[in-house]
Curated annotation (Swiss-Prot):
InterPro entries: Na/Ala_symport. GO terms for molecular function: amino acid:sodium symporter activity. Belongs to the alanine or glycine:cation symporter (AGCS) (TC 2.A.25) family. It is found in: Cell membrane. It comes from the Bacteria. The gene is yrbD. Keywords: Amino-acid transport, Cell membrane, Ion transport, Membrane, Sodium, Sodium transport, Symport, Transmembrane, Transmembrane helix, Transport. GO terms for cellular component: plasma membrane. Its main location: membrane. The chain crosses the membrane at residues 11-31, 66-88, 92-114, 139-159, 172-192, 205-225, 238-258, 292-312, 350-370, 390-410, 416-436. It is a multi-pass membrane protein. This is Putative sodium/proton-dependent alanine carrier protein YrbD.
Amino acid sequence: MADFVASLNAVLWSTPVIYILLGIGFAFSIMTRFLQVRHLKEMIVQMFKGKSSEAGVSSFQALSIALSGRVGTGNIAGVATAIAFGGPGAVFWMWAIAFIGAASAFVESTLAQIYKVKQDGQYRGGPAYYIEKGLGIKWFAVLFAAAALIAMAFLMPGVQSNSIAAGIQNAFGISPFVTGCGLVLLLGFIIFGGVKRIANAAQMIVPFMAIGYILLSLIIIVMNVSELPAVISLIFKSAFALDSAFGGLIGMAISWGVKRGIYSNEAGQGTGPHPAAAAEVSHPVKQGLVQAFSVYIDTLFVCSATAFMILFTGMYNTQAADGSFIVHQLKGVEAGPGFTQAAIDSVLPGFGAGFVAIALFFFAFTTIMAYYYIAETNIAYLARGRESKWAMLGLKLIILAATFYGTVKTASLAWALGDAGLGIMVWLNVIAIVLLAKPALLALKDYERQKKQGLDPIFDPKALGIKNADFWEKEYTHESERVS
C-alpha cells in the first residue's frame, strides 16, 4: 500500500508537474493583469459585504469556510516539513505560489459562482458543476466529483486528525483513542447541523485561531528582532542557491515550497470553489476576489508566522538529499509540529507543546469541517434529481470513521494518502480552469467596467455571451423586473 502511494505521488508531484502549476498561476496572473495587486483593496472591502440568505451564506461566511479548509496542519506541520527537506528557501517558494496562486483561486472561485445552481433550497457549485455546464463534458464532471468525494471523505481527514492526536498526546499525555472519540463527537454535532451550522462555526473559530497564532509569532519576532535581516537574507539566498550551505537544495526548495504551499493554500486545487459558490453576491467576481485574498491570509500570514517562529529562533533541522544534516539543531525531533513547539519553548519555556496542540486542534478540526462540506456538495452533484438522504447520512458516518482512524494510524501514511488525494484533484481541476478561463476573464472585465461607472456590479451572463449560467440568467431577469 505504502509503496503504491509513494509511486503515485512521484508521478503526481514530479518536478515537471510543479513547474506546470507555477506556469499556470503565472499565466492567470498575466491574463488578469495581476489582479492580486491591482484589486487588493477591493478584496478586503468585499470580505465584509453581503448578507446570508435562506439559500446562501455571506461573503465572510464563505471566506471562513474556505479558510477553514485552507488553514490546517499544512500551516504548522507542512511548513516545518518544507524547511526540513527544502531548507529556508522553501519559504520563498511558498510565498511565490501564494502570490501567483491567488490568480488561480480567483479564476476557479469566479467560475464556481458563474455556474452555481440552486439545489434543494441551497446554492451549490464547484468544479463538477462548472465542468459540466461550462465545458459540457459530463463524464469529466462525474470523475472530478468522485475523486473529490474519495479524497475529502476517505483520504484527507486522516492527515488532520493524526496531527491533532499527536499534538495532544505530546502536550497533555492523552491517548489518540480518547482524542479520536472526542473529535468524532464534536465533529458529528457540527456536520449533522447542516451547512448553516458549519458556516456559523467557521466564522466564529477561524478569525480567532488565525489572529491568535499570528500574534504569538509577532511576539517571537519582536523578541528576536535583531535576527530579521539575517533571516530574510537566508530565505532569499537559499531560494536561489546563493547560500553556500543550502546551495545544493534549490530543486528541493522549489519542490517542497510549491507542494506544501499548494497543500496549504489550496489555490487551483478545486476545494475553495465549493464554499465560494455558496456566497450570496450580486456578481461572481466579488467572491472571486474574496477567495483570492484568502490565499494571502493562509500563506503570507499564517504560514509565514510558522516559518518566522522556526527560523528566527533557529529551531529546525534540514537534511540534504543523501540524508545528511545541513542544519541539526533539534536532535531526535522529527520534521513537523515539533519544530514549532521548540521555537516557542525557546522563547516562552513550557508554553510550546500546549499552544501548538491547541492551535493544531483548531486548524485541523475546522479543516475536517470544510472537507465534509466539499464532499457533501459533490454528493449533491452526483445525486441531482434523486433522493440523497441516505447518501448524505453515509457520508457523515464515513468521514467520522476516517477522522477516528486517522488518529491511530502512522503520520507518514496519512501524509502520503493526503498528497495523493490532493494531487488527483489538482490535476482534474487545473485542466478544467485552463479550458474555462475565458468566462472568468469576461466576468472580470464586466465587473471592472461597472465599477468605473460608479455602479454596484450585477451580472448578466447573456450580455457577455456566457452560456448555461442558468442561475444568473434568472437572477438578472428578476432584478430587471424588480427595478422596472
